[in-house]
């Protein structure tokens, strides 16, 4: 999933598209948008000028080369596919949350209603179709 962060306005449409495609509940977000903003006002001969900025970062599972989440999963549910996507087999997952604790990006999320972990799967089905 490529995002040109220099063009990102923080509209969260990518986050909503993910939630819609995966039919996620309001409390679950596989993609999150972070904002970093700052700046100040400066006076120049009685005229005030703004010097403000905002940057946005769209974060999801990074499908790491050497994922920490897969190393701590006792059931083997969290695994890396041959195509590089890190996914959770929800039928095998025991919901121990070790993967969540190990992931530096907070990608695996516990779904209390399902009783197991869920996470971004990189839309590997769409990627396989060339979408």
Give residue spans per PLM region.
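Non-ligating segments of multi-cofactor redox enzymes
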Residues: 1-131
